[in-house]
């Protein structure tokens, strides 16, 4: 999606998500509209798979992603789970189908939870 399209369709004038954020696989709601800020930050996320396979951290395949929804409080999420610690990182997964990672949280920063735009859908 082009930056201009992204800005108009998904990001409000205040920089927040215009639409609900959903799991691409099962459609479960991850975030309500207006609850996350658009952020550009380069983060590596392992390839999508089920939570038990993700927590071992042994597979280095993945993507370097730059466009994210930033959430400052873990209780803002509607439906998200967390993996066991992988170093100082916890990956975010869909709480219903356990597919992920859809996002990333560094344990050093208690108030920053990133959800990759490429790993979710919007409604």
Curated annotation (Swiss-Prot):
From the UniProt record, which GO molecular function terms apply? guanyl-nucleotide exchange factor activity; zinc ion binding
Write the record's keywords in alphabetical order, separated by commas: Acetylation, Guanine-nucleotide releasing factor, Metal-binding, Protein transport, Transport, Zinc
Q: Which residues bind Zn(2+)?
A: 23, 26, 94, 97
Instruction: Point out residues bearing the modification N-acetylmethionine.
Output: 1
The answer to whether the entry has keyword Protein transport is: yes
Gene3D superfamilies xrefs: Metal Binding Protein, Guanine Nucleotide Exchange Factor, Chain A (2.170.150.10)
Q: Enumerate the CDD domains for this protein.
A: RabGEF
Q: Name one GO biological process term.
A: small GTPase-mediated signal transduction
| Membership in a protein family | Belongs to the DSS4/MSS4 family.
* Described purpose of this protein according to its UniProt entry: Guanine-nucleotide-releasing protein that acts on members of the SEC4/YPT1/RAB subfamily. Stimulates GDP release from both YPT1, RAB3A and RAB10, but is less active on these proteins than on the SEC4 protein. Might play a general role in vesicular transport.
Q: What is this protein called?
A: Guanine nucleotide exchange factor MSS4
Taxonomy of the source species: Eukaryota, Metazoa, Chordata, Craniata, Vertebrata
């Amino acid at each position: 999606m082009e930056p201009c399209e992204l800005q108009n369709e998904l990001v409000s004038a205040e920089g927040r998500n215009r639409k609900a954020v959903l799991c691409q696989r099962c459609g479960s709601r991850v975030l309500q509209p207006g609850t996350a800020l658009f952020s550009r930050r380069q983060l590596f996320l392992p390839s999508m798979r089920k939570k038990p396979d993700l927590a071992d951290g042994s597979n280095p395949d993945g993507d370097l992603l730059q466009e994210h929804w930033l959430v400052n409080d873990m209780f803002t999420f509607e439906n998200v789970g967390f993996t066991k610690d992988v170093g100082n990182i916890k990956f975010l997964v869909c709480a219903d189908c356990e597919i992920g990672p859809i996002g990333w949280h560094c344990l050093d920063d208690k108030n920053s939870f990133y959800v990759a735009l490429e790993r979710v859908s919007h409604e």
